[in-house]
Amino acid sequence: MAIKALRGMKDILPPLSEKYLNFLQTASHYAHNYGFSYIETPLLEETALFKRSVGESSDIVGKEMYQFIDKGGNDIVLRPEGTAGVVRSFIEHKLDRQGGTHRFFYYGSMFRYERPQKGRFRQFHQFGVESFGEPSVYEDAAIITLAKAILDHFEIDYTLKINSLGCPVCLKPYREELIKFLEDQEHICDDCKRRRKLNPIRVLDCKNEQCQQIYENAPKLINNLCEECNQEFQTLKNLLDNEGIIYEVDENLVRGLDYYTRTAFEFVSNALGAQNAVAGGGRYDNLVEMLGGKPTPAVGFAIGIERILDLIKDKPVQREGYFIGVMLPEALNIAFDIATKLRQSNRVIMEYKPKSLKALLKGADRNNAKYALIIGEDEYNEGLVWIKDLERKEEKRVDIQNFMER
């Protein structure tokens, strides 16, 4: 019986892998332009990191982590999200003690044991950015603008939703008001019944349709913001308005992780069905301190790459580079020299087995080459190479030495 990839985990093969690399290169370029530097953290982390950051009442920690005890007796987990690991690295390398602003971007695999479905996998990929040390709401606006720039580059249709999750000052009275509301709700799902005692605000993130209808009448955090949080949210909206960024205020948007405070946002697409969030993030000013670091304001976002790839429109295949082949074995060394030189600045595919002209041209077409370079018997004897432009359908024979010296 053949061994296959695990359920919910997929190989990324051409042509999808080309689209994947193009997304990473483009997103990295935009992040660099916004002042972010690349960071890479391990796939494995201590389980305690996510229990303290994501929250023990979250679905991720409660149901979805790939958690195990290693041979050394350590309780470890395959990372389910990227932010906590970056924060851990930020603290471990004492960047929280340096002051100033530190901006990082990252990409890589994340793991969650959940039911695979469209737009949701057990191994998935994220591109994310994290900014540490800048408390200004202008940084929140810049982060949202960066995410928008990446999505706009790929001509993705989306709706931007924003909300404010307040601060500890606003949350305490709101939490009490929400608990009082939830006590009378007997038709919510079992998960929400469990959460209403452990972390009542998390119920608003429930995707159950009946629960969502009930929560339409729940008290809204945005109506309970303290003066400072309310002013900051108004400033954020003004900044987005000034940039011509269209958004909706979603009063039930709370994100799926416990560490967010104040600004929260999501980019959603109707083209994805139930799993419609393509990017999301917000501010998490308390997380660095929660994980043992010096109090540091922070804000960031993550983009789900698989969902983005589903939305990026396929473009016509562009011919690129050279296909090199020979019709006699004696010409292989010369052809190999040509390939080595061209590969310094071009994509080159070489066929090592001598074939007929017809077969070689089929190979060039199959590999979407722009040019076919072929050495037949006559070319070999005369020191020439036959070149065909497969887009323009033009062909010529040129001196090999002159071609190599170009």
Curated annotation (Swiss-Prot):
Keyword set includes RNA-binding: no
Single GO molecular function: histidine-tRNA ligase activity
EC number: 6.1.1.21
GO cellular component terms given for this protein: cytoplasm
Superkingdom field: Bacteria
An annotated GO BP: histidyl-tRNA aminoacylation
Xref: InterPro entries: aa-tRNA-synth_II, aa-tRNA-synth_II/BPL/LPL, Anticodon-bd, Anticodon-bd_dom_sf, His-tRNA-ligase, HisRS-like_core, HisRS/HisZ
Catalytic activity of the protein: tRNA(His) + L-histidine + ATP = L-histidyl-tRNA(His) + AMP + diphosphate + H(+)
PROSITE patterns found in the cross-reference section: AA_TRNA_LIGASE_II
Keyword Metal-binding: no
Subcellular location(s) of the protein: Cytoplasm
Record keywords: Aminoacyl-tRNA synthetase, ATP-binding, Cytoplasm, Ligase, Nucleotide-binding, Protein biosynthesis
One Pfam family, short name: tRNA-synt_His
Subunit record text: Homodimer.
Similarity field: Belongs to the class-II aminoacyl-tRNA synthetase family.
NCBIfam families in UniProt: hisS
UniProt protein name: Histidine--tRNA ligase
Species in which this protein is naturally found: Nitratiruptor sp. (strain SB155-2)
